[in-house]
Amino acid sequence: MDIKHNTPERDEFRATDGADVALWRWPQSKARPTLHWAHATGFHGRLYRPLLDELATDVNVLAWDMRGHGASAGAANVSTFRGWETYYRDMTALLDSQDEPVWLAGHSIGATTSIMAAARRPDKVLGLILAEPVIMDPVQGLKLGLAKLLRQSHRLSLAAGAARRRRVFDSHAAALDNYRGRGGFKTWPEAWLEAYVQHAFVPQEDQLQLACSPEWESTTFAHTEHNPWPGIRQLRCPVIALAAEHGSTFSPAAQKRLQTLLPSADVRVVAGTTHFLPMEQNDTVRDAIQQLALSGCREN
């Protein structure tokens, strides 16, 4: 299949609270395995088109816009938000909407959400490919859990920084110029930056406004999962976990503990990468997904 023709179409599924969550579908074929990709906080599914368009030649690709993000911005509701548990429930509802088991892959919160959904619906998940999952070791988790208990987690750097994020631009070109070479975007190839900007905004009169509001992004960071281990212990499917060499959200101590709990898991540190591993090492993520999703294997 020609990569140029791998254009996703919008679909949606109904979350348990009645909200509609956008789901992007690349061209599908019954003969191929299905893979769902879950994006990182503040982003959207079509950001990952440089990766997903390639994968769509071999697998049926799905990618949601997480609640409050991208085309699902309208599903944001702070009054009913229950931290990352809300996203876990949404992903579980997505799995329930599928006729057949699927492979789950994701980046950052998307990877962690995939873990929790797989733990809750083991019959619906064939395996996990995790790129920079947010998996804290017990010491990190204790500190964050205490900050959340004391209602101070909104002061943490990621949450505070997101709350200050610029939300309005005059044009897509102005947004590109603002992001290029700055902050977390420093290591992004141009194609990735363009894919992000293309679908990150909604019209606001004669300007553009971030679809994922700074308040929603900040709230999501403030509720970062501090104890994913009960879910990890329940996993029974194949797992590949890719960790960054620098500034990883999947610390060496957490890697060691996961490997102890899941001896068959394939844990790899990708040299030279940061938390934005999928953008920096697109081929590495693609190869890991193909290794599992095209293998036809499944642990029982």
Regions found by a protein language model. Name each.
Residues A22-A76:
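Conserved HGGG/HGGXW glycine-rich cap/lid loop of the alpha/beta-hydrolase fold
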Residues M66-A105, L146, D287:
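Active-site loop/oxyanion-hole signature of alpha/beta-hydrolase fold enzymes
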Residues E100-L144:
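Conserved hydrolase catalytic core segment
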Residues L126-V168:
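Flexible "cap/lid" loop of the alpha/beta hydrolase fold
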Residues A163-A222:
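Conserved alpha/beta-hydrolase catalytic His-Asp/Glu region
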Residues H199-T260:
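Conserved serine/cysteine hydrolase catalytic core
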Residues V270-N282:
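Catalytic histidine-centered segment of alpha/beta-hydrolase-like enzymes
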Residues M279-Q291:
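Post-His helix in hydrolase/transferase enzymes
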